Regions:
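Q-loop/switch helix immediately C-terminal to the Walker
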Residues: 120, 127-141
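Conserved ABC ATPase signature
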Residues: 171-175, 179
Length: 205
């Protein structure tokens, strides 16, 4: 549950594993590069806890394969977690574990309350849609179907990431990798989310 300090997000003892685990790795014995030497279970995320406060930028640092992306994708419901809890202040006033939310409520959280920028733009963009349509998809998912608003928001977002607004009808597949990443950043911001998840956001920039 969110504490009195009004954290935007609280994550407690997040677990994500591939495999059933065994007595050895469940007792938190040392692993070999996140893999149990006895049963072969891979622990992508193991007992991760942190808080995020309003206006705070929190970075998770670790070597390649240490689980940084897995944490982000778990919070965005791309992975089904093995255990742990996460409480979002904007969802049920931080009193309900979002990992226990229904699929319908998870879509609401993703569409209204969160934005996600993946390391690979292919995961966050529809490459055959125009940039404007990518933004519109996110805005419509957040229950806003006002065309004038979507047009204005498209111009605002493209200008913010220094992409010519005259290219808004072009699909991201026509853009360089860095431009694709900037379009993806804009799409994640389209619904003004209270929480923005960034997975190595500067890739290609």
């Amino acid at each position: 549950m969110i504490n009195k300090e009004e954290a935007v997000l609280q994550v407690r003892d997040l677990l994500l594993r591939y495999g059933n685990g065994c007595e050895c790795c469940r007792s938190r014995q040392p692993l070999e590069k996140n893999r149990c030497p006895r049963c072969g279970t891979v622990w992508a995320v193991r007992n991760v806890s942190f808080d995020v406060y309003p206006g705070e930028v929190l970075g998770i640092v670790g070597e390649s394969g240490s689980g940084k992306s897995s944490v982000m994708k778990s919070l965005y419901f791309d992975h089904e977690v093995t255990g742990g809890s996460a409480f979002l202040k904007q969802y049920q006033d931080g009193k309900i574990n979002i990992f226990g939310a229904s699929s319908q409520q998870r879509r609401y959280i993703k569409n209204h309350l969160m934005g996600m920028v993946y390391q690979n733009p292919l995961l966050g963009l529809r490459m055959d849609y125009s940039s404007a349509a990518n933004f519109a998809e996110k805005i419509i998912a957040a229950s806003n179907r006002n065309v004038a608003f979507m047009d204005g928001r498209t111009v605002e977002l493209l200008e913010a990431v220094e992409i010519l607004t005259s290219r808004r009808a072009e699909p991201p597949r026509n853009f360089s990798g860095g431009m694709q990443q900037r379009v993806q950043i804009s799409k994640a911001l389209a619904n003004n989310p209270g929480l923005l998840l960034l997975d190595e956001v500067t890739t290609g920039l």
